[in-house]
Swiss-Prot record:
Transmembrane segments: none annotated. GO terms for biological process: acetylcholine receptor signaling pathway; regulation of neurotransmitter receptor activity; synaptic transmission, cholinergic. The gene is LYNX1. Gene3D superfamilies: CD59. Disulfide bonds join 23-46, 26-33, 39-64, 68-85, 86-91. The lineage of its organism: Eukaryota, Metazoa, Chordata, Craniata, Vertebrata. It is found in: Cell membrane; Cell projection, Dendrite; Endoplasmic reticulum. One of its GO terms (cellular component) is endoplasmic reticulum. This is Ly-6/neurotoxin-like protein 1. It holds the Pfam family Toxin_TOLIP. It is a lipid-anchor; GPI-anchor. Keywords: Cell membrane, Cell projection, Disulfide bond, Endoplasmic reticulum, Glycoprotein, GPI-anchor, Lipoprotein, Membrane, Signal. GO terms for molecular function: acetylcholine receptor binding; acetylcholine receptor inhibitor activity; acetylcholine receptor regulator activity; ion channel inhibitor activity. Interacts with nAChRs containing alpha-4:beta-2 (CHRNA4:CHRNB2) and alpha-7 (CHRNA7) subunits. Interacts with CHRNA4 probably in the endoplasmic reticulum prior to nAChR pentameric assembly. Interacts with KCNA2/Potassium voltage-gated channel subfamily A member 2. A lipid is attached at residue 92 (GPI-anchor amidated asparagine).
């Protein structure tokens, strides 16, 4: 084997291998949903969106997305919602509450407190 070819093979072995992200992907009218799926190669985020129709009724949507912006919308004129993002395999499972979810819970409690 020529020295140049050997050097090329050593360089290839040292390169990191790109691996597709695994996320839960689903839309469910309930507390949570689980459906592990391999995302396309250009996807780098798992996203979870929770839309609250009432304090006890919500829709959870989970997906693979190429870019993601975490948001909290208080639902002044419509439904309240939160979007959270993460970047490791199956990170959008049940897990702990995200800061965005906690902030929305406080907003909903403050709104309910103001109604009584």
């Amino acid at each position: 084997m020529t020295p140049l070819l050997a050097l090329f093979l050593v360089a290839l072995v040292g390169l990191p291998v790109a691996q597709a992200l695994d996320c839960h992907v689903c839309a469910y009218n309930g507390e949570n949903c689980f459906n592990p799926m391999r995302c396309p190669a250009m996807v780098s985020y798992c996203m979870t969106t929770r839309t609250y129709y009432t304090p006890t009724r919500m829709k959870v949507s989970k997906s693979c997305v190429p870019s993601c912006f975490e948001t909290v919308y208080d639902g002044y004129s419509k439904h309240a919602s939160t979007t959270s993002c993460c970047q490791y395999d199956l990170c959008n499972g049940a897990g702990l509450a995200t800061p965005a979810t906690l902030a929305l819970a406080l907003i909903l409690l403050a709104t309910l407190w103001g109604l009584f």
